[in-house]
């Protein structure tokens, strides 16, 4: 993992619909964190825990489409802005801080994959859903192919893996 000190790319965590329209978004700085990817992407971070709680069975956005939208990401098709740049036009939410220690698995229902948080040095949710990674400081450069591979997929946070379905584990290598 190579983290370079260049101009920083800033990220917002988004819930989007199937057409990639923003439903709600969150800003890490509202929780006292930096908004570069590596400034808040670790297990136990209060911002990431609060966002992922919304994706848990207890949360309002369980099994939703997620993207960690970077401000250097590509523009949306047939639009003048990328998702990060569009955020001001949509609802910013700031839920009360939540802990998610009982939720061990980040599950991708679109790709039938999962990440076991106990096996990751950094938090898998922001890394796997990052869009625009590698284009700014605070990003993960020379990243493995899994980084960003879950952007815009249906994600949930679970205590255990879904019954009756085969899910493939994703690891950070």
Label for each model-derived stretch:
Residues 37-173:
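Low-complexity intrinsically disordered segments
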Residues 2-32:
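Short, extreme N-terminal segment that most often corresponds to the first beta-strand
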